[in-house]
């Protein structure tokens, strides 16, 4: 299993699939507001959750987080008012160099 070290502890990485119709049409200001809200909720939840990156597509946002478990990610979504339709633990990461 893929894990990152936070505070001396190995934490798993997760991908969150968020259904958000029209996500690809959100303005930079909209995305900044969503990001600010997410950062505030993360600060309130404590150091065991870390947002790494997000990918915005036409109707979904895929977010990559490091956290101890799925529960804190669903709590983050609830507190922030964000959808969290699918939360999946990452088993491995590959890239072109994997095939070399």
Segments and roles (model prediction):
Residues 1-43, 50, 95-100:
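Short S/T/G/P-rich N-terminal loop/turn motif that feeds into the first structured element of a domain
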Residues 16, 63, 73:
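Hydrophobic pocket/interface hotspot
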Residues 18-20, 64-68:
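Short beta-strand-to-loop capping motifs
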Residues 47-53, 86:
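A short linear hydrophobic-aromatic micro-motif
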Residues 52-62:
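Amphipathic, hydrophobic secondary-structure cores in small proteins
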Residues 58, 93-94:
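Short secondary-structure capping/turn micro-motifs that flank functional sites
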Residues 66-93:
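An amphipathic, aromatic/His-enriched active-site/gating alpha helix that lines ligand/cofactor pockets
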């Amino acid at each position: 299993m893929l894990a990152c070290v936070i505070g001396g502890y190995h934490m798993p990485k997760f991908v969150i699939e968020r259904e958000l119709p029209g996500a690809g049409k959100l303005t930079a200001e909209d995305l900044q507001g969503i990001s600010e809200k997410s950062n505030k909720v993360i600060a309130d939840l404590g150091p065991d959750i870390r947002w790494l990156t997000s990918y915005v597509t036409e109707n979904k946002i895929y977010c990559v987080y490091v956290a101890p478990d799925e529960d804190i990610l669903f709590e983050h979504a609830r507190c922030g008012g964000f959808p969290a339709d699918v939360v999946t633990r990452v088993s491995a990461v590959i890239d072109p160099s994997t095939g070399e």
